Design a protein with these regions (language model features):
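Acidic/glycine-enriched connector segments
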Residues: 2-23, 31-180, 193
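Helicase-associated low-complexity regulatory tails and linkers flanking the ATPase motor
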Residues: 165, 184-185, 189
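A charged, well-structured terminal subsegment
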Residues: 188-201
Length: 202
């Protein structure tokens, strides 16, 4: 169990705490976006220090930023690159990363990408999402799918964006920074007990 602590705006209030049982993080975001290499490396190091392993997709943009950072990190063996197409496996393996097609054959490209995304979300404990597509200045469809499916599966998501996701009765939304590296918002499915997600609400 890994516990995260989020300070609240009212200084008198105790920090909000939530826990995740597993130790795998999905690194995801816009295929047109980017994160500086040093920032990716810092995030990877901080997550690995907590014992996390990594899932990352096969697309361009944010996926590529994290793949390249993982490839030169000491933790490259603790990463799975989930691919929608066999043609993308070779590039990830050429970086020294483990990669595999995770969808059944015969799907359309759009369906394969969707299935790959859902495969990663289901197997992750939490998600780091960089959702804004800079070409349109809003969330892309892939990022929306990641967020919706993570909430459905009760996985906390750190959204690295200037504007928060929409308010919802299904999760708590908290402005925060991640390891002092990224500013954004935690979206945390409603907790119970020691901080685990409450399946009974869904």
């Amino acid at each position: 169990m890994v516990t995260f602590q989020v300070p609240l705006k009212q200084e008198a209030e105790k920090p909000f705490r939530f826990s995740v049982a597993g130790r795998s993080v999905l690194l995801a975001g816009s295929r047109h976006g980017s994160v500086p290499h040093d920032t990716c490396c810092q995030l990877i190091q901080q997550f690995h220090h907590l014992g996390f392993r990594f899932f990352v997709g096969c697309a361009a943009g944010i996926d590529r930023c994290f793949r390249e950072a993982l490839s030169v990190s000491p933790y490259h063996k603790d990463c799975v690159v989930a691919c929608a197409f066999s043609s993308r496996v070779y590039h990830a393996r050429s970086l020294g990363l483990y990669a595999s097609v995770v969808v059944p054959p015969g799907l359309t490209p759009a369906a394969a990408l969707r299935r790959r995304t859902l495969w990663m979300v289901r197997r992750s404990s939490l998600v780091l999402l960089v959702p804004v597509d800079p070409t349109i200045d809003r969330w892309g469809p892939g990022s929306r799918l990641v967020f919706r499916s993570a909430m459905y599966h009760l996985k906390p998501v750190f959204v690295a964006a200037l504007d928060p996701p929409p308010e919802s009765v299904h999760y708590r939304l908290l402005p925060a920074d991640l390891f002092g590296v990224l500013r954004g918002y935690w979206a945390v499915p409603h907790p119970f007990g020691d901080g685990g997600p409450c399946d009974d609400e869904y």
